[in-house]
């Protein structure tokens, strides 16, 4: 578990729940994080686990939901060479719910179908509404560009600048909408491929305000010493020389440029 809270590393954690034990606690460079390794036995029942953090006389309690794990026979079959895969950028496919086109409080607050880099309004409901069309074309798998929230100032339509890894972008819909699409696809013998980006995150991910470790980002020192006005010119960009990863004779500068360089200034390389 990743736990964030003000000076949380000063607290001791206690869990009194049948089948769960704290194996190890890892402190970060920032005092506001704890990384907790848990052992959960196979017989542990689902329920609300109370995480108790104590420091002298002060105690913090957080209710953590332990959900029912899907059994092996419920796990989805992976895609393979027999599949015909259709890649969808959800924002560009179909608008099934006009009420979520603009969400108050998010940084990008416009729809403009005349602008290639603006949002166009497509969503999960739009894909679900057109499942027959996709099936009739013979596709057996749908690969969606990431649908997790991208709360960026611009260019958020593509989904590759995640700002919260646990929240569906509300402009695409809700978790219930995602599960509904999964159910509809399954009923039509269509697989749903989840795309998730862990190489980098969006510039406005919440941990960017308080990085857990001194090496959480590649070229972190350059980022910390940059401002909004200088980040673009200071960024060390990826050279995209992919062959250097396999090339035993590649120059170290080329290897690191590929491995650690940033894609763009708005997507910090993790």
What are these regions (language model features)?
Residues 1-9, 68-70:
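Beta-strand/beta-sandwich contexts
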Residues 17-24:
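Short, solvent-exposed loop/linker segments at beta-strand-coil boundaries, enriched for Pro/Gly
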Residues 28-37:
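Aromatic sugar-binding surface patches on proteins
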Residues 39-45:
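Short, surface-exposed loop/turn segments at beta-strand-coil junctions that are enriched for proline
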Residues 48, 59-68:
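Edge beta-strands of extracellular beta-sandwich domains
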Residues 53-55:
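Conserved structural position at the C-terminal beta-strand
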Residues 66-87, 92, 96:
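Low-complexity, Pro/Ser/Thr- and charge-rich linker/hinge segments at domain boundaries
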Residues 93-140, 145-270:
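Substrate-binding/active-site clefts of carbohydrate-active enzymes
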């Amino acid at each position: 578990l990743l736990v964030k809270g003000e000076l949380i590393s000063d607290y001791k954690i206690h869990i009194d729940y049948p089948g769960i034990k704290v194996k190890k606690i890892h402190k970060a460079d920032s005092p506001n994080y704890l990384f907790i390794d848990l052992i959960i036995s196979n017989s542990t029942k689902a329920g609300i686990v109370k995480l108790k953090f104590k420091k002298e006389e002060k105690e913090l309690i957080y209710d953590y939901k332990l959900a029912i794990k899907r059994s092996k026979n419920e796990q989805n079959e992976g895609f393979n060479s027999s599949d015909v895969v259709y890649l969808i950028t959800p924002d560009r496919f179909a608008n099934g719910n006009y009420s979520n086109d603009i969400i108050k409080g998010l940084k990008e607050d416009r729809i403009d179908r005349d602008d290639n880099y603006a949002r166009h309004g497509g969503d999960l409901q739009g894909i679900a509404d057109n499942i027959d069309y996709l099936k009739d074309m013979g596709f057996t798998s749908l690969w969606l560009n990431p649908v997790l929230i991208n709360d960026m100032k611009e260019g958020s339509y593509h989904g590759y600048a995640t700002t919260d890894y646990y929240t569906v972008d509300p402009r695409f819909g809700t978790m219930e909408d995602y599960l509904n699409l999964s159910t509809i696809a399954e009923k039509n013998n269509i697989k749903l491929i989840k795309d998730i980006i862990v190489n980098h995150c969006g510039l406005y991910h919440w941990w960017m305000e308080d990085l857990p470790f001194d090496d959480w980002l590649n070229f972190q020192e350059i980022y910390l010493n940059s401002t909004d006005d200088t980040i673009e010119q200071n960024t060390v960009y990826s050279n995209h020389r992919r062959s250097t990863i396999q090339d035993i004779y590649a120059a170290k500068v080329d290897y690191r440029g590929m491995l650690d360089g940033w894609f763009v200034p708005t997507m910090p390389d993790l």
